């Protein structure tokens, strides 16, 4: 769990996302409150519940990107899901409890990777011994093993092929699927796990010494880990630090004066209520309490309104943040300011072909103008429009770059207008092309 202050979290988000100060403040405070809660006495800690967030704003303004960057920053189990993927209990499809099961799997993977690093040195030595066994045999003399160990560490044997015994991942086991629920898994128990543990099968693989390195280290690391303790720690991390980002929540609103076809939409909202309020979900690894999992919901709310959500669900999302539509200046900043801005990406991509791409300031202004103009006349898809416009403008350069190694390609405002100006002005054409 990160111990960054809210100000530091906002400055980290500023490196990748332009504007939206209110949303950044809200998520930074929520993330810091996770850390603050863990500093409290046990009794009070149980009483402090997370303040869930509802982000409201048009598409393409940074809602999902804020969540994505927050996940990397938090170092906590994080899951992004679309609310539209779930159906009411009793209907065909995934039920909302699958969110928590998936979050537990994410946490187990995170905890395992962290613990593998702790035992990496011991696992490295054990893996080295297994490689030497494959090269010279388990009964070889100490002198022979030392000689080969020196060659192995010097990298002289990297290309040599060896046969190693590895744990079978149970690939031969048929998948157990619940009829009528594609992609659903048994929550309480996994049939594959039972047979995998009973079988304990190994298989022989023929790989190079270099390729065997990662396989054997991962296997030896797992032997040194206590799997029960690992799972228990992962569940504890989920219960105290887990974050769920519920995207497209406006799509499960039941709009006023609308009848028929919406039964399972309202049902999904009702199923989400106990999950967000706090309940216990059964997973194949054990029971997980959701009382202290932070939920961040987001939606464009173009057609529906936040008030169309069930009143109980509105009450469980107490912090409302409105994200602003992007202006021309925002579009310009998005092209240049973030660490991995679109301009930097295209320049780097062309450099791989030996082509220097020179995009002038007036070209950046022209690109921003075109994106804003098309957004206002066709459909406002926010910053995503910039990708469409950039692809259109740089289409010729991308296609012929491999034939122009060593050249410098200059893109200015005139070049932008030549390749896209007429399309942007013609609303009917841009409706289909941009």
From Swiss-Prot:
Keywords annotated in UniProt: ATP-binding, Chaperone, Cytoplasm, Nucleotide-binding, Stress response
Main location: cytoplasm
GO molecular function: ATP binding; ATP hydrolysis activity; peptidase activity; proteasome-activating activity
Localization per record: Cytoplasm
GO cellular component, one term: HslUV protease complex
GO-annotated biological processes: protein unfolding; proteolysis involved in protein catabolic process
Superkingdom in the source lineage: Bacteria
NCBIfam families: hslU (TIGR00390), PRK05201.1 (NF003544)
Record-stated family: Belongs to the ClpX chaperone family. HslU subfamily.
Function: ATPase subunit of a proteasome-like degradation complex; this subunit has chaperone activity. The binding of ATP and its subsequent hydrolysis by HslU are essential for unfolding of protein substrates subsequently hydrolyzed by HslV. HslU recognizes the N-terminal part of its protein substrates and unfolds these before they are guided to HslV for hydrolysis.
Subunit structure and binding partners: A double ring-shaped homohexamer of HslV is capped on each side by a ring-shaped HslU homohexamer. The assembly of the HslU/HslV complex is dependent on binding of ATP.
Designated name of the protein: ATP-dependent protease ATPase subunit HslU
Naturally occurring in which organism (per UniProt): Bradyrhizobium sp. (strain ORS 278)
Gene: hslU
